[in-house]
């Protein structure tokens, strides 16, 4: 068993036939999508958009190649706005905090990732998808949302 799927019981028959991937179109999320295509007949490639995001059409570049590589898997590309989720996480006082605390204000990247994962959970609930993956790599475990020592104990309560 690889490290990437150590937390998943792949023998559990209740995983369903589909998986979702938070998909940017980069090499890490494309690899995650390919790994999901090896196990599921349907893979939902979910790209989130909000004000300030550029080049959100880039993910479509690799989809046709994945369809050719995994002809038995159906890939669905979803481009989903998630701005209100980001605003809820980032908070309504971000400009005030920037003025008050300057560079000590929290970096929005963490809030953005949390909002994407939150919106991904909603997507999965709406579409009866029980498995979701992203292209997070171990080198980013300095972010709380990508560090199992921080996140997993809270989820396992």
Q: Whereabouts are the PLM-identified features?
A:
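Hydrophobic/aromatic beta-strand patches that form the interior of the parallel beta-sheet core
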Residues: 44-46, 78, 133
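Structural alpha-beta junctions
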Residues: 39-42, 67-76, 155-157
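ATP-dependent adenylation/pyrophosphate-handling site
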Residues: 7-66
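Short, hinge-like loop/turn segments at secondary-structure boundaries
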Residues: 61-65, 95-97, 150-152
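Active-site adenylate/phosphate-handling loop in enzymes that bind or generate adenylated species
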Residues: 102-157
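Short loop/turn segments at strand-loop or loop-helix junctions that form parts
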Residues: 48, 82, 134-137
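A conserved beta-strand->alpha-helix junction
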Residues: 69-99
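Phosphate/ATP-binding catalytic cores across multiple sugar-kinase/actin-like superfamilies
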Residues: 1-12, 123
């Amino acid at each position: 068993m690889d490290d990437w799927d150590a937390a998943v019981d792949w023998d559990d028959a209740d995983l369903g036939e589909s998986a979702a991937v938070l998909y940017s179109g980069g090499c890490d999320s494309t690899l995650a999508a390919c790994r999901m295509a090896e196990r599921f007949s349907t893979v939902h490639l979910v790209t989130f958009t909000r004000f300030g995001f550029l080049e959100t059409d880039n993910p479509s570049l690799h989809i046709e190649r994945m369809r050719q590589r995994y002809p038995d898997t159906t890939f669905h590309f979803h481009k989903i706005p998630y701005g209100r989720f980001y605003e809820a996480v980032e908070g309504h006082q971000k400009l005030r905090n920037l003025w008050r605390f300057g560079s000590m204000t929290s970096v929005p990247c963490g809030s953005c990732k949390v909002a994407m994962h939150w919106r991904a959970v909603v997507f999965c609930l709406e579409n009866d998808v029980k498995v979701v993956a992203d292209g997070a790599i171990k080198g980013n475990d300095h972010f709380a949302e990508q560090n199992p020592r921080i996140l997993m104990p809270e989820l396992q309560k």
